[in-house]
Amino acid sequence: MDLTQYIASIENYPKEGITFRDISPLMASGKAYSYAIREIVQYACDKDIDMIVGPEARGFIIGCPVAVELGIGFAPVRKPGKLPREVISASYEKEYGLDTLTMHADAIKPGQRVLIVDDLLATGGTVKATIDLVEKLGGIVAGCAFLIELDGLNGRQAIGDYDCKVLMHFPG
């Protein structure tokens, strides 16, 4: 199935010169959404995954159904102040400074095999910070899965040798 037909491209959003890739049409199509989830589930089946980890907010939208299909748990990664219990944090570079992500300190048990799931791989900052969080807790990052990769933004370089599944490519 060609999932690219379910992605809306919005020029100059959120700012001039940026093309935003909106996954809302994909989610609105039961056929396309379930196909995308099944593709990631199939990828995960070969990796003996114990836990899905997804950064807010669209990582929840993709990661939770994958976790349900696999019959395993989901651990959210959020911005500071959004998780109610003890957290660990990791910071990463953004275009205009640092940003921080947090995860509950007990979200991952040492040795658990984790698949990180998000909608988009661009510069790789979010996924690299998520990898750092998982590894701080002793988890093993078995792979990463994304609906979309924006080519030319060097996201793969940021995540290094971690195995990666991408369903669609768009220019960055």
Curated annotation (Swiss-Prot):
A GO cellular component entry from the record: cytoplasm
Keywords: Cytoplasm, Glycosyltransferase, Purine salvage, Transferase
Annotated compartments: Cytoplasm
Molecular function GO labels: adenine binding; adenine phosphoribosyltransferase activity; AMP binding
Reactions accelerated catalytically: AMP + diphosphate = 5-phospho-alpha-D-ribose 1-diphosphate + adenine
Pathway: Purine metabolism; AMP biosynthesis via salvage pathway; AMP from adenine: step 1/1
Catalytic class of the enzyme: transferase
EC number: 2.4.2.7
UniProt GO BP: adenine salvage; AMP salvage; purine ribonucleoside salvage
Pfam families per UniProt: Pribosyltran
Primary location class: cytoplasm
Summary of subunit composition and partner proteins: Homodimer.
HAMAP family per the UniProt record, alphabetical: Aden_phosphoribosyltr
Recorded family membership: Belongs to the purine/pyrimidine phosphoribosyltransferase family.
Function: Catalyzes a salvage reaction resulting in the formation of AMP, that is energically less costly than de novo synthesis.
Protein name listed in UniProt: Adenine phosphoribosyltransferase
Species annotation: Streptococcus equi subsp. zooepidemicus (strain MGCS10565)
